Regions:
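Short acidic linear motifs
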Residues: 2-305
């Protein structure tokens, strides 16, 4: 009897130390996997519900979630009121005179490195004047564009932030041409003619105001900043009247209106929603680690305050 009990105890110990232990471990592992998957599924469902509720708030706010909706969100402008079309026409004329803006850049660089006492300044003034005379047709278009209050550029939203729209380049060239024109007026003692040039520079920058893109709003701010660099160059080559300084101050102040950046964030959010929900709709998808949670309508209200 005692021998039988010892034999049974030895079998139990062998079971727990061998195959039995492995079986228990396997069961525990499977239970852990099931628990992990169940938790992951619960978290995924919770996240989906959160995203669905966010989309509902976005829809209620009348904001877009697809490229088609984003295209409608960027206000349409009749051709006869669209400054963007006139800027495009001006750029075609300017490219025929100064391809890629090389001459304007060189003349501005020379001016920015000059001072009032430079002996070469009169010669540079004549060179600038001769170049500006060739740009008369361009100025006609730029002056006409400045009278139009709205602008809408042809932009393909599905391309996303991987390609710069064509109008970024030609707007910069037109803006720097107006900057050169303002500095030339100051050099010739016609400081009262500088203010209209600065106003056209401002109008050109503000033509990007409604574009729902962060890149466009950053460029808009950079283009507004060109007025500051214009003032710096003007102070190097001339004594400015108080009225001229007042014009620079009035036209160089940055607006505190957050609405353009709110629109830009709406556009960026729309792009990334498309990236993750319908990646085939994107021209080229940038490699990004994750999508940032951009402002929902409640966050935008806070931003506007």
């Amino acid at each position: 009897m005692r021998w039988r009990r010892r034999k049974e105890g030895r079998k139990r110990r062998e079971w727990f130390s061998g195959a039995g232990c492995a079986a228990v471990g396997g069961v525990l592992f499977l239970l852990g996997v099931v628990a992990y998957l169940a938790l992951g599924n619960a978290l995924t469902n919770a996240r989906r519900e959160q995203v669905a509720k966010l989309k509902e708030r976005i829809r209620e706010a009348g904001q877009p979630l697809t490229f088609e909706e984003l295209n409608a969100y960027y206000p349409a402008v009749p051709d006869e009121e669209n400054a963007a079309l006139v800027y495009q026409e001006a750029s075609v004329l300017l490219d025929a005179i100064d391809p890629n803006g090389a001459t304007v850049d060189a003349l501005l660089r020379s001016l920015e490195l000059s001072s009032r006492n430079d002996a070469s300044l009169p010669e540079l003034q004549q060179e600038i004047g001769a170049f500006l005379e060739r740009c008369g047709g361009v100025f006609v278009h730029l002056e006409r564009a400045a009278t139009l209050p709205k602008a809408r550029y042809p932009i393909e939203f599905s391309v996303g932030p991987t390609e710069a729209p064509a109008h970024y380049g030609y707007l910069k060239r037109c803006l720097r041409l107006e900057k050169l024109r303002a500095l030339h007026a100051i050099l010739e003692g016609r400081q009262w003619d500088a203010a209209p040039c600065l106003e056209r520079m401002q109008h050109l920058a503000e033509s990007l105001r409604d574009e729902p893109s962060v890149a466009s709003q950053m460029l808009r701010a950079a283009y507004r900043g060109e007025q500051i660099t214009c003032l710096k160059a003007a102070l190097n080559v001339a004594y400015l009247y108080p009225e001229t300084l007042a014009d620079f101050q009035r036209l160089s102040l940055e607006t505190s209106d957050p609405e353009p950046m709110v629109r830009a964030l709406v556009g960026e959010r729309c792009y990334w929603v498309e990236v993750f929900e319908t990646p085939g709709a994107i021209g080229r998808v940038s490699a990004m680690g994750r999508v940032l949670d951009y402002f929902d309508p409640a966050g935008q209200s806070t931003m506007r305050q």
